[in-house]
Amino acid sequence: IVENVFNQLNEVKDKRVENFKKSADQIEEVLGRIVNRADKATANGVDTSSITASANNAKAAIAEARSLITAEAGKIYSVSITAEANLKSDLAKTRETLNGDLLKIQQSLKSARDMVHNTAVTLAKISNINQYEVASSTTSESANQ
């Protein structure tokens, strides 16, 4: 029975780690789109230094979250049971440890998401940001004929 409990704890951990990885990927994807829009504005002469600084902070937060996720993925939760009378408390300690570790990752991802959100808000403050385009260097169809 105890082995089944540990297997379930590790399965929960694995599922949560996968969800955290997906969340980190989504946050990073959104940040990438924000940076691309900021690059368009920069190419058109707009000062985006505050966006760049905010994006760098967000990248650091995402990297920190990913390192926590990687560390958690390598952990295997188990406990050495000293006596049958202590079984319940030993299992509770292990479960609390797992919950604490997962909560740290969740808070780290929330912090990264908030930083990306702040970067997006800073980008939105630039007037007419959607009008900026980067000139393409491709040749037209008529030039090839």
Predicted features by range, described:
Residues 1-27, 68-72, 76-145:
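C-terminal amphipathic alpha-helix
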Residues 17-62:
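Amphipathic, heptad-repeat alpha-helical segments
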